[in-house]
Amino acid sequence: VRLRAGAVVKAADRSSLRGRFYCRGTEFASRGGSVVQEDGGGVAGWWHPLTRIGFRFGVGYFGGIGVAGVLGLVPILLAGVGVETGSVLHLSSLVRPPIEWTAAHVLGLRVTSAQVGSDSAFQWTGLFLLVVMSGVATGVWSVLDRGRVGYTRLFAWTQLYLRFVLALAMFYFGMAKAIPTQMPFVLNRLVEPYGNFSPEGVLWSQVSVSQPYEIALGAAELLAGVLLLVPRATAAGALLCAVDMTQVFLLNMTYDIRLKTVSSQFLLLSLFLLAPYARRLFAALFDGNPGPAIRTVPLFGSARANRIALAAQLAVGLGLLGVFGAQNWQQWSKETPDLYGIYRVDGFSSEGYARDPLLTDELRWRRVVIDRPFHVSDPMVLTIQHMDDSFEVYGGTIDPKRHIIDLHHRIALGTFEETPVRVRLTYWWPAPGRMVIDANDYAGHRIHTFFTEVDPKSFPLLERGFSWVQEQPYNR
């Protein structure tokens, strides 16, 4: 039967069209008695009505997630190259009024900040509104476009966009583990009582103790991101992302990490990208018969244009990977402070009078830990452990020529919020492995204290290496 696009089909012939057919290699579909050429052509594609509805919702919802994710990562990328990010960060304030109203009147939440990338009330409410808006948009789209039988070309561009969103996220989080800056080893964890740890602190410390494990976690996420850059490897990349994000989401839920919204959305996005391959994967895993390959739609009609598009995808993706790598390496390669280490207090006096090591003494120090900076702006972190095992954390600088320690910020435990302070300490070495610190004004007191340096490798957590042969368990 020869038909042309736009031709009207007689009522007696409409039932034989069965939704779609081909004419000289071009796909057509029947819509209300008219023959309409499918967009993009070249790929067979009558979609089930539920598939069309799910795709419409996915375009709206995950498209919004992608925009939010990109806007969240852009300031990080720009800050890494020294670009002011105030105008980008101002965008969140534009959507704050409707989010605050919805949080207060619909969800019963109180928005205290426009923080994104966390489990804040702002982000939970934003996700709720995105679900509602995507549902409404899906309904309107379904009514206005009820005659369409598939979205082959739109699917190709949507998949490209979402692949890059997910790959960008994998590069960001994966590189922070492959170059261990997300969960770095912190010296003061060696002297902090285990019961004082938060669940998040337990997980962070557990991962940081084994750098190979943390690097392996990051490598898996980076591999998933690289695979997502290659169209033919989309299924492999999405599957690996789904596995990675399932583990991350489980840890976030069981250790109460404030990234539940982020990890859950990346997991859902991975499954959305994997959905077109689900039937084939199921058949390959359980039937041993993968079936025919998925026929994809090219982005452009020209083979040359598609080759250029592929090269551009790889260039942009690998370029972003390099930027994240450079940023994390810059943070990781910061110089170790001159006084890096753990120091045990042997004697402490204030106003010239010695203070006995009583657990009730709120002024006396027990230990001082000087560590590398990871989540603060200063080049050195100094932690004071008091007799009751409470901690004061400061950020500051060390002048090794003048033997001066200047503390510039008081750092809140758990949040890393910085409060400006001005405390000056002087130090000197009376003997190898011994140090003396004086201060004319610490908490309103003139103090004098002397220390013995403690080797971090003397702790069981660090002295134990790797052993292939173990005759007895070593579970302390």
Regions found by a protein language model. Give the residues of each.
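Membrane-interface segments at or immediately adjacent to transmembrane helices
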Residues: 313-404
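Transmembrane alpha-helix/helix-exit interface in multi-pass inner-membrane proteins
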Residues: 167-191
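Hydrophobic alpha-helical segments
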Residues: 187-287
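Cytosolic-side transmembrane helix boundary signature
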Residues: 144, 148, 275-312
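Individual transmembrane alpha-helix segments
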Residues: 105-133, 210-219
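Alpha-helical transmembrane segments of multi-pass membrane proteins
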Residues: 63-78
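Internal/C-terminal transmembrane anchor helices
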Residues: 164, 168, 298-331
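Edge beta-strand at a domain terminus
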Residues: 333, 438-476
